[in-house]
Amino acid sequence: MRYGFFDISQDFITIFCPKKTLKNCMFGLIGSRTQATLRQEKNQNFSFFVNEANEIAGFNFFDIKKSFRRGLISHHFTAGLNYPSLKLVKKISELLNYDLTPLAKKVPFVVCEVISAIPIPNTHLKRCKVNTGSNKSLDVVCGADNVRVGLKTVLVHVGGVLPDGTIIKKAKIAGYDSMGMLCSEKELNLKPKNQGIIEIKSHIKIGKSFLDVYLNNSEKFSAWVSTKKRVTGN
């Protein structure tokens, strides 16, 4: 499916609410659209960035209390799981007068299962295939010592954005394609910050939104994350 000049499968909306540095501000980024030349258009309370295909690539709200009702912007954005609910996307679309709702169901962080993990000679890396619940497995290069066949963990798709602002792109690592990234708790800004990629318990469904898993179980962390000791990270 095409959306302008970009593959919509790589378009994920990421939200940042940096409460410690810029109170009441919200920043939005649409991952794969950032490579285009942007221009800025301003409004009294927000600005947005438009690429050459006339698609919105990012937006800023300078006073979220003026634009969004209380509770619509969830606290979970500060936990690193920074992509919005459908309700929030609808409200943003209304304010920007631009329909972003086709992207609302695109989930960048999902539960996956490692189905193969082959060591790459002369490196600490493994070329992995992961099952995300779709018809096609994905190739991902990972350097975590605890990556192994049968492990359920968190995949961030190409076009997803980490809490530190890193955009995940298709990459070639040690000569192999890598279509995403397997994540550690540290990379998702979650606690406890164990080493290695996240180990999710086997009863959690493959393909499930990791945001849903986290929000439903955040007070009982051990309900979905293995508590076995981890080793060095990726």
Swiss-Prot record:
Q: Report the Pfam families cross-referenced here.
A: tRNA_bind
User: What would be an example GO MF term here?
Assistant: tRNA binding
PROSITE patterns with a match to the protein in the record: TRBD
CDD domains the UniProt entry points to = tRNA_bind_bactPheRS
Signal peptide (residue range): none
Q: Which UniProt keywords apply?
A: RNA-binding, tRNA-binding
Question: Where is each tRNA-binding domain found?
Answer: 103-211
Question: In its keyword annotation, does this UniProt entry include Disulfide bond?
Answer: no
Name of the protein in question: Uncharacterized protein MG449 homolog
Per the UniProt record, the source organism is Mycoplasma pneumoniae (strain ATCC 29342 / M129 / Subtype 1)
